[in-house]
Regions:
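Pyridoxal 5′-phosphate
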Residues: 1-241
Length: 241
């Protein structure tokens, strides 16, 4: 990226125009949360100034228009990850999406003695809900280890899949190392062992093309605030069976 284009991009982010300790702000924490461009700030302002109303709960003009905007956003998200709108559930963030799966599908299907497979590379939001579920259901958790290069050990995965786990939940891209896991191949192996797969795509969807139809995962989660969107909005993709 040349200097002129870089400057044009910076201009789209009002917060980056401020200074910190007398110096121009350089923000390097987008893996935690991204800053918001003026187009997003303007869209939020426009909604609250011109459309603010409950969605799917009224027949007056504002409610109808707000519902249209809400469903148009769902259609945009569905197209972005190559799926249908009826497989997109809006939640507050990826953490809530994972907990929703844990407290609905998993609570009904993971029983005493069953195994859940995770990896050592997971964010706590993709560990704690499964630990709580395992304690509640009497299930076991197996972890795919990370090697000295920060790569998931595929031999560990092969061994754990021999236990016929009910669920394999793992991150597409590490929030710590940036490691890109071979998700499609890992999902295929998990399905062959009879497991459903939840993919934490909070770090991948903002930065790379993600096609849920091609990946063939059963659940996928991500957050708006990590991809230039506002806080308080996230997505749970759930494949219809």
């Amino acid at each position: 990226m040349n200097e002129r284009i870089f400057a044009q991009v910076r201009q789209q982010f009002p917060l980056l125009q401020r200074t910190v300790n007398g110096k121009r702000l350089v923000y390097l924490d987008s893996a935690a949360t991204s800053q918001k461009p003026v187009s997003v700030l303007d869209a939020e302002r426009t909604f609250y100034q011109t459309l603010n109303a409950n969605v799917h709960r009224g027949v007056h003009t504002l409610s109808v228009k707000a519902t249209e905007a809400y469903e148009n956003a769902r259609a945009t998200v569905a197209k972005f990850i190559n799926t249908d709108t009826d497989q997109i559930v809006f939640v507050r963030n990826a953490t809530e999406a994972i907990n929703l799966v844990a407290r609905t599908w998993a609570r009904q299907n993971v029983k005493n003695g069953d195994m859940i497979v995770l990896t050592q590379a997971e964010h706590h939001s993709n560990i704690v809900p499964w630990q709580e579920l395992a304690k509640e259901a009497g299930a076991r958790i197996g972890y795919v280890r990370v090697d000295e290069n920060g790569v998931l050990r595929q031999d560990d995965l092969a061994e754990l899949l021999q236990h016929k786990p009910k669920l394999f939940a793992f991150t597409h891209v590490s929030n710590v190392l940036g490691t890109i896991n071979p998700a499609k191949d890992m999902i295929r192996k998990a399905h062959a062992a009879g497991a459903l797969v939840l993919l934490d795509a909070a770090q991948s969807v903002p930065h790379m093309a993600v096609d849920v139809d091609d990946l063939d995962c059963d659940f996928m989660v991500f957050s708006g605030h990590k991809m230039l969107g506002p806080m308080g909005i996230g997505v749970l993709y759930g494949r219809k069976k």
